[in-house]
Amino acid sequence: MKIAITITVLMLSICCSSASSDICPGFLQVLEALLLGSESNYEAALKPFNPASDLQNAGTQLKRLVDTLPQETRINIVKLTEKILTSPLCEQDLRV
């Protein structure tokens, strides 16, 4: 459960920051592959970004951790992400 919370908080900070008014479609593909795809799908989604080997390894470790979550939880994280991204709140600067 801690992994799911960590991923959700990470996605919120990236997706709703004032610097991300337009979200990179490639990022969303990587995120979807991370949560719902196979390890090879995830690695293929990362490939266009040409990550250094240490970054690639860290991403693969994260993918393996995410894969330990129940499928329903991963699907619900995707639904939560979609809800957040389509929310009018993402158009506002929510920082205190």
Swiss-Prot record:
This is Uteroglobin. Belongs to the secretoglobin family. Club cells (nonciliated cells of the surface epithelium of the pulmonary airways). InterPro entries: Secretoglobin, Secretoglobin_1C-like, Secretoglobin_sf, Uteroglobin. It is found in: Secreted. One of its GO terms (molecular function) is phospholipase A2 inhibitor activity. It comes from Rattus norvegicus. Keywords: Disulfide bond, Phospholipase A2 inhibitor, Secreted, Signal. Binds phosphatidylcholine, phosphatidylinositol, polychlorinated biphenyls (PCB) and weakly progesterone, potent inhibitor of phospholipase A2. GO terms for cellular component: cytoplasm; extracellular space; nuclear envelope; secretory granule. One of its GO terms (biological process) is response to glucocorticoid. Coiled coil: none annotated. Its main location: secreted. Antiparallel homodimer; disulfide-linked. Interaction with LMBR1L is controversial. Residues 1-19 form the signal peptide. Induction: By glucocorticoids.
